Amino acid sequence: MSVIKLVDLDLKNKRVFIRADLNVPVKDGKVTSDARITASMATINHCLKQGAKVMVTSHLGRPEEGVWTEENSLQPVADDIARRLGKPVRLIKDWVEGGFEVASGELVVLENCRINKGEKKNLEETAKKYASLCDVFVMDAFGTAHRAEASTHGIAKYAPIACAGILLTEELDALTKALHQPAHPLVAIVGGSKVSTKLTVLESLAEKVDQLVVGGGIANTFLKAAGNNIGKSLCEDELVPVAKSLMDKMNKRNATIPIAVDVVVGKKFAEDEAAVLKAANAVSDDDMIFDIGPESAQELVDIIMKAGTVVWNGPVGVFEFDQFGEGTRAIAKAIAETDAFTLAGGGDTIAAIQKYDIYDKVSYISTAGGAFLEFLEGKKLPAVEILELRAK
């Protein structure tokens, strides 16, 4: 993937506009989970060290266009970054028309870009105003790279130079390594509640991977396609034929979708529900499947341990409830121990990684949700595509 890289540029005294992903949860004016800020600091620090005049913006929440509210303000983010840098960081509220100065070696935070008129629609006029504020535009928000907006795509068209930040470069390198030059066997684990939301991902991966592990509600649709009774479990009946054809397609090229042989069931979705282990072909009509059993988990552990590359997106059970979390825990442990290149992404997956404390044992953790999935689908991400065009 040929894009201009931030680290190859001379930034001294240059006006640098960074689009980061600082969309973090905020409660009572304080950031409650700062992983995305931490991930963005490499690019910010690099620009400051080089003596650039640094501006950074991001979206936060879902503000109404043209309406500023305290709950969608980046002020808590600016405070968090100021604490990290050990110096004050100004928040510039109305910045689209310019009219503010930034000193060399200074960082300012530009208020939530989604408040700006024309941001979401990627209006040319808005994008040109953004571009006029900088000498160098840095795209560092992989999490929004699948959206063509004025701050992710439009500005990159018109800025004198448009490049990829350190985080974006790392994300693209890791994803490319996992999907375009993978060490085999290539294993993908796709969990989640619905086949429909991940159907295009499953179809795309079914052509590439050696083993496609399905988990969560998605797996129930495949269990049913394999002829099992799944009781009252979450399932999309209309997609059973699709699941069947994916299984056939993979079998034809000697690849597999492993189907659970044992499952953990309950009668209702509740934190105090008793977990009962059953063979996959012995599920009662009033059972709900909430996890895979130990035999199935062991099969997946063996697959992961023998893999060359593992891509993980989504848990395999209701891991929020400990009694239905053993399958996901076993997978997490195997991912931590395997010699394979491991890549994980998506909110629930990161929550599982944190719960089972394997954060530093995964080769690469993607901060993105939707963009991560679209890359897995083999889709072109508009914000990356424009950087490639600008590098020509």
Swiss-Prot record:
Major location category of this protein: cytoplasm
Residues noted as binding substrate in the record, renumbered to the chain: D21, L22, N23, R36, H59, L60, G61, R62, R114, R147
A GO CC annotation given for this chain: cytosol
Recorded GO MF terms: ADP binding; ATP binding; phosphoglycerate kinase activity
Keywords: ATP-binding, Cytoplasm, Glycolysis, Kinase, Nucleotide-binding, Transferase
EC number per UniProt: 2.7.2.3
Annotated binding of ATP, by residue: K198, E320, G346, G347, D348, T349
Pathway(s) where this gene product acts: Carbohydrate degradation; glycolysis; pyruvate from D-glyceraldehyde 3-phosphate: step 2/5
Pfam family, one: PGK
Catalytic activity field: (2R)-3-phosphoglycerate + ATP = (2R)-3-phospho-glyceroyl phosphate + ADP
Membrane spanning stretches: none
Cellular compartment(s): Cytoplasm
The keyword Manganese is annotated on this UniProt entry: no
Signal peptide: none
Domain of life where this protein originates: Bacteria
GO BP annotations, alphabetical order: gluconeogenesis; glycolytic process
HAMAP family to which the protein is assigned, alphabetical: Phosphoglyc_kinase
Description of how the protein assembles with itself and partners: Monomer.
Family membership noted in the UniProt record: Belongs to the phosphoglycerate kinase family.
Protein name: Phosphoglycerate kinase
Originating species: Nitrosomonas europaea (strain ATCC 19718 / CIP 103999 / KCTC 2705 / NBRC 14298)
Taxon lineage: Bacteria, Pseudomonadati, Pseudomonadota, Betaproteobacteria, Nitrosomonadales
Gene: pgk
